[in-house]
Amino acid sequence: MKKPVVIGLAIAAIVAVIAGGTWWYQSRQDDGLTLYGNVDIRTVNISFRVGGRLASLNVDEGDAIKAGQVLGELDHAPYENALMQAKAGVSVAQAQYDLMLAGYRDEEIAQAAAAVRQAQAAYDYAQNFYNRQQGLWKSRTISANDLENARSSRDQAQATLKSAQDKLSQYRTGNREQDIAQAKASLEQAKAQLAQAQLDLQDTTLIAPANGTLLTRAVEPGSMLNAGSTVLTLSLTRPVWVRAYVDERNLSQTQPGRDILLYTDGRPDKPYHGKIGFVSPTAEFTPKTVETPDLRTDLVYRLRIIVTDADDALRQGMPVTVKFNDEVRHE
């Protein structure tokens, strides 16, 4: 056999082997389950927990955001004033509670005792005057009205004496437990108001809750905002999830933890890798976004696939082809 013929046969054999191997690989690739899904759209609406005038925003749409980053601030002044008032309230309540615990000073007790002596003298005088008036009334020297006035003065002096005696007794025995408990409760209430004022002031600073990309900027500085009004919308970029749906007959192939290959139109020959992270326990009618025609009238189960080697080319909402072929487990 001539040498050119031998070379030609060898080349033909090599081509045949390559073609056969390609056919075998593709047939093996097509043997497994194929689903169609989308990269999950995950967003967070960011807002202030308190209301007020928006003083500043530090980010624009498209900016990369880091968790803990300061995004903007409200006008602090009203909340700083409220904090000062709350601190003063705690000081007043603390002083009152300390007074209740300490009881009364010796000077106050001495003043109360002097008031009792003064009230006692006034009462004694009023009682003696009333006694004299009684004698005069019996001898018809004064009128009944004069006697009644003397009795009224005596009764008033007696009430004043009783009040002074009670006050002296309180000063000597100290404050009642109920009064001390009430003062303590007032102090705790003032401390709670202070803590809330501190939290409100802290909440005038808008902090990023997670890493992501700023999707929308809904308001501008100078706007008056209510608590909870959306200021920014953040698109969460990590972790990347793919949402897909599987019918009941293929449900057994979708155990959590199974390795998956994910293909996009932009990378048809270079798949992403992922793992099944969640399989819905309940069936639902196929969402309109599912691209597979033969699933649209079925009851299906939702899958969440966690992409383990995601990059910035894998965008939210992007359609993805999900491959469950057996070779995935060994890649």
From Swiss-Prot:
InterPro entries: CusB_D23 (IPR032317), UPF0194_membrane_YbhG (IPR022936), UPF0194_transport (IPR050465). Belongs to the UPF0194 family. This is UPF0194 membrane protein YbhG. The gene is ybhG. It comes from the Bacteria. Residues 1-19 form the signal peptide. HAMAP family: UPF0194 (MF_01304). Gene3D superfamilies: 2.40.30.170, 2.40.50.100, Helix hairpin bin. Keywords: Coiled coil, Periplasm, Signal. It is found in: Periplasm. It holds the Pfam family HlyD_D23. Residues 107-208 form a coiled coil. GO terms for cellular component: periplasmic space. The keyword Signal applies.
